[in-house]
Amino acid sequence: MPTTYELEFDHADMVAVLAKPGDAIRAELNSHQAHLLHTAIGISGESGELLDAIKIHCIYQKLLDRANVIEELGDLEFYMEGLRQGLGITR
């Protein structure tokens, strides 16, 4: 039996009405906004990769892949510096 939530919302219709297609999003971004979005997405992605490396060590008791952690931290620094520059923020 469907829940009240499922009866009230048709997710396919909601997405069709509310979600912007990628071309529309891209067309609305100027160069500065695209840079900010790119660097923020990069931070998010690299954070997830760092979290996964730490999770594997802590939860699954695997040897910490220090080289990977160092690489992910470097990647985070890269995107964070790009975002700082894009926002005019200094360290």
Each model region followed by its residue ranges:
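Flexible "arm" and connector segments at domain edges
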Residues: M1-R91
